[in-house]
Amino acid sequence: MKTYLDLLSHVLNKGIDRTDRTGVGTRSVFGYQMRFDLQAGFPLLTTKKLHLRSIIYELLWFLRGDTNIAWLKEHGVSIWDEWADEKGNLGPIYGYQWRSWPAPDGRHIDQISNLLMMIKKTPDSRRLIVSAWNPASIKEMALPPCHCFFQFYVADGKLSCQLYQRSADIFLGIPFNIASYALLTMMIAQVSGLKVGDFIHTLGDAHLYSNHFEQAQHQLSRIPNALPFMRINPAVTDLFSFKFEDFELLNYDAQPHIKAPIAV
């Protein structure tokens, strides 16, 4: 994952120090792009160990259209706890927008189901898009979408995905986002009868929080190991039928976890 370490180094050395909503302070750049060949391995960081269980369950939770943390907590995942209200609700965040975008006429649009249909029927379309950024719902969300808009592209029997992320917490969030959208691309490719292509990650405000500088330097001192591979149960042909047990990570040789505080 030299690609990720290059981002880390670029922001540390070339970024601009700014204030931010959380009050912590950041060093950031505006506009950065990474590309990962998904046939070369699963893009999960090896320079610090990541909690893959949280990544997989969060993605399945999004695909369920769920916006309450109860299901996540049932499966030992706490990454959304800081933002939930006393009943566990987060408002109309990712899952709701993906699966039940509210239309002005009262309908609810299942963007993911529409996407799957279009990939199969019109794979050359330039409208293979899902958006989580709904201006009408922002004030109702516990946290507005950071990874807000993604598009798929089919060529030579391969499925590629490009994500636009408006706000990119490089040390804590981005490693999760890379793995999550890489996995989503693999899942959609499988149920669509396609091979995987590239995952392209385009960042808007790419930032390191000021209390992550030391951890970032520590991570940059480590040498990346070979990427692992993700084995997905080939029997699953429906995107919404995937379970945690359908995924097996192979040859993940990661260095120790690096702890860092989260900015809420």
Curated annotation (Swiss-Prot):
GO terms for biological process: dTMP biosynthetic process; dTTP biosynthetic process; methylation. Pathway: Pyrimidine metabolism; dTTP biosynthesis. It catalyses: dUMP + (6R)-5,10-methylene-5,6,7,8-tetrahydrofolate = 7,8-dihydrofolate + dTMP. Its main location: cytoplasm. It comes from the Bacteria. Its EC number is 2.1.1.45. Transmembrane segments: none annotated. DUMP binds at R21, R126, R127, R166, S167, A168, D169, N177, H207, L208, Y209. GO terms for cellular component: cytosol. InterPro entries: Thymidate_synth/dCMP_Mease, Thymidate_synth/dCMP_Mease_dom, Thymidate_synth/dCMP_Mease_sf, Thymidylate_synthase, Thymidylate_synthase_AS. The keyword Hydrolase does not apply. (6R)-5,10-methylene-5,6,7,8-tetrahydrofolate binds at H51, D169, A263. It is found in: Cytoplasm. Catalyzes the reductive methylation of 2'-deoxyuridine-5'-monophosphate (dUMP) to 2'-deoxythymidine-5'-monophosphate (dTMP) while utilizing 5,10-methylenetetrahydrofolate (mTHF) as the methyl donor and reductant in the reaction, yielding dihydrofolate (DHF) as a by-product. This enzymatic reaction provides an intracellular de novo source of dTMP, an essential precursor for DNA biosynthesis. Belongs to the thymidylate synthase family. Bacterial-type ThyA subfamily. This is Thymidylate synthase. It comes from Bartonella henselae (strain ATCC 49882 / DSM 28221 / CCUG 30454 / Houston 1) (Rochalimaea henselae). The gene is thyA.
